Amino acid sequence: MDFFENAYQQIPPWDIGRPQREFVELAGSGAITGDVLDVGCGTGENALYLAGRGHRVWGIDAAPTAIEKAQEKAKERGIQVTFLIRNTLNLDQIDRVFDTVIDSGFFHTLSDEERPCFIRNLSGVIKSGGQYFMLCFSDREPGGYGPRRVTKEEIRDAFRDGWHINYIRAAVFENRTNPAGARAWLSSISKL
């Protein structure tokens, strides 16, 4: 069984039962616009929150149990979100483009070899001028527990061609393991 599918048999540490504060603040500031794709959406808290604010939202995740839980939440809350089981590296299987793509903890799961494939496919599902907002673990997070840490330089290198990095700023990745959250980077990246 896949690591993530197995994790969703219980409540994984990153599933906090509400949207990540960073995405709530982005939405409140008006930074998230139009149709939204949530890559690696898990049980859908960020997607459901944005749909509740009036966005048309699609959420994709490779873990069937996560998508099943997201669909149950949408039904219980009476919120319309299209949740799909998809390999997030194969975004080219989605036949539409989005104004905004959000990523709450997906990028930091990618290997160095997977990153170019993801970014190439991401480019195909986001409109020119569209925004990609990524929340990932920072190299400033101490210890070895949890996902891979990502440096600012890795983000800059990965999005060097065809993208403009608006900012990479210190943020918090909320989780159930550490009440203070984990040190993270929040990046705003525009497709050229």
Tell me what each language-model feature is.
Residues D99:
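Conserved acidic residues
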